[in-house]
Amino acid sequence: MFLMKPVCVLLVTCVLHRSHAWSVNNFLMTGPKAYLVYSSSVAAGAQSGIEECKYQFAWDRWNCPERALQLSSHGGLRSANRETAFVHAISSAGVMYTLTRNCSLGDFDNCGCDDSRNGQLGGQGWLWGGCSDNVGFGEAISKQFVDALETGQDARAAMNLHNNEAGRKAVKGTMKRTCKCHGVSGSCTTQTCWLQLPEFREVGAHLKEKYHAALKVDLLQGAGNSAAGRGAIADTFRSISTRELVHLEDSPDYCLENKTLGLLGTEGRECLRRGRALGRWERRSCRRLCGDCGLAVEERRAETVSSCNCKFHWCCAVRCEQCRRRVTKYFCSRAERPPRGAAHKPGKNS
């Protein structure tokens, strides 16, 4: 158990680019000097959350735009929909993940492997041992930083805190058990096992699944303005598993531009049609972003230049040729025609 005084953490809108509402430079931290050692890890974790959000939603109608990445729920730019839920969860997970990893790497003097269960029986034929990643440490420190952003007691704050916790649960729930065999001539009579962090991509994929299954919480208008209202909010969220994402509002129509909400719509977005490595979701992106939004798919030819036929020359240089290649790209463009297939439904991001 790590008991610490709360830290004040503020996320502010970038002065130079107001649309870039959340970047690692937006973290302004004050508090005990002891916390300063964690600041670079917190910033790196926040950055990993940004990158993972953009990866997971690259071919969705909502593609994790910068304006969506402001963690403060009172800045006027944020809704309480399922996309907001994902942003909170993935950012919380990113901070916890990075703190845990850096702890195991020995970056902090007061933290190392979690050996609290070493020597104990873990299951049939194996014992706890080795160097487990210290998720308890990462969880405690990240909670002090990320949850400090929520100072309100209304439904929005409760939603954000719930999704922060869901992000931390995702890190713990995707940890991998790694084992080493012991015995004569590799007989593996017994095994010593420890827990390791997965690739952060696995955490992101797990939370993307939770995003699709997010639960909408219906509360009475104005709940939270009284002690009874705050109690009702607490009871409602307490009844929902902290492994699930929750939201209060339906999502807007991401096909359309909405300047008030900072949404650009899908016109002009690139989509994918061909490629050996494309998954089903990527291959359907032109239909999802263009056709179902009432837009045509415009084919554009372009020439790319890249290094190729690289050779190592003794000693010590690598020389490459410049190869030109014609490629075809696809974009959503305005067209006077009805949507292809079934009409899109407002609020859907798929």
From Swiss-Prot:
Palmitoleoylation is required for efficient binding to frizzled receptors. Depalmitoleoylation leads to Wnt signaling pathway inhibition. Proteolytic processing by TIKI1 and TIKI2 promotes oxidation and formation of large disulfide-bond oligomers, leading to inactivation of WNT8B. It is found in: Secreted, Extracellular space, Extracellular matrix. Its main location: secreted. It comes from the Eukaryota. SMART domains: WNT1 (SM00097). Glycans are attached at N102, N258. A lipid is attached at S185 (O-palmitoleoyl serine). One of its GO terms (molecular function) is signaling receptor binding. It holds the Pfam family wnt. Gene3D superfamilies: 3.30.2460.20. InterPro entries: Wnt (IPR005817), Wnt8 (IPR013301), Wnt_C (IPR043158), Wnt_CS (IPR018161). The keyword S-adenosyl-L-methionine does not apply. One of its GO terms (cellular component) is extracellular region. GO terms for biological process: animal organ morphogenesis; cell-cell signaling; gene expression; negative regulation of gene expression; positive regulation of gene expression; signal transduction; Wnt signaling pathway. Residues 1-21 form the signal peptide. Keywords: Developmental protein, Disulfide bond, Extracellular matrix, Glycoprotein, Lipoprotein, Secreted, Signal, Wnt signaling pathway. Belongs to the Wnt family. Ligand for members of the frizzled family of seven transmembrane receptors. May play an important role in the development and differentiation of certain forebrain structures, notably the hippocampus. This is Protein Wnt-8b. It comes from Mus musculus. The gene is Wnt8b.
